[in-house]
């Protein structure tokens, strides 16, 4: 398979993986707990920053076009501009952060990407919700810290074990 064909197939498959991970969802207030970030970090860790960002962009474009790829089998532009849209945009910024920092190691790049995703999501959520910084952090970050750390570490471990089989 030609390299460009292989890249297109891998990016598309990982965009699908992110969607499947998004469908595994448990509502927690305004924000659902999903395995989306596991899919994001597997994409970045296994494909690298550039191709991982492409997979994330494909995922977001499919959702924007109305495909039900987001949590709760939802899609459409409304999801990208809704109350949790900042987290969706944060996935792309997370990918770009990973891409910029991957030369320092996968785990530090993943952690930095997760922090950027939180930042983007919290700023966006603040524009929609009442309350100050602490209220936003209690709603958008605190309940997700431990599960997100576990997903990030699982993605890191899987990336280390599977990398030689993907690229």
Give residue ranges: language-model regions.
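Residue-level recognition of membrane-helix boundary sites in multi-pass small-molecule transporters
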Residues: 50-51, 85, 135
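Membrane-helix interface "capping/anchor" motifs
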Residues: 44-56, 101-108
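Hydrophobic transmembrane alpha-helices
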Residues: 1-53, 94-99, 159-163
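Membrane-embedded alpha-helical hairpins and interfacial helices in multi-pass inner-membrane proteins
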Residues: 73, 103-167
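Interfacial aromatic-anchored transmembrane helix boundaries in multi-pass membrane proteins
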Residues: 22-35, 60-94
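Short helix-perturbing small/polar motifs within transmembrane alpha-helices
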Residues: 9-15, 20, 77-119
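Structural signal for membrane-spanning alpha-helices in multi-pass inner-membrane proteins
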Residues: 18, 22, 44, 63, ...
């Amino acid at each position: 398979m030609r390299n460009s064909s292989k890249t297109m197939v891998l990016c598309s498959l990982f965009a699908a993986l992110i969607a499947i991970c998004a469908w595994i969802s448990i509502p927690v207030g305004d924000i659902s707990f999903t395995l989306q970030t596991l899919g994001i970090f597997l994409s970045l860790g296994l494909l690298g920053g550039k191709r991982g960002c492409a997979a994330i962009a494909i995922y977001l474009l499919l959702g924007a076009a109305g495909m039900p790829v987001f949590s709760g089998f939802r899609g459409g532009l409304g999801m990208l501009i809704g109350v949790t849209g900042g987290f969706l945009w944060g996935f792309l910024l997370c990918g770009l952060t990973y891409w910029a920092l991957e030369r320092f190691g996968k785990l530090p790049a993943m952690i930095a990407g997760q922090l950027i995703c939180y930042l983007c999501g919290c700023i966006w959520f603040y524009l929609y919700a009442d309350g100050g910084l602490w209220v936003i952090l209690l709603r958008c970050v605190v309940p997700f810290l431990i599960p997100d750390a576990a997903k990030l570490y699982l993605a890191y471990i899987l990336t280390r074990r599977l990398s030689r089989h993907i690229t």
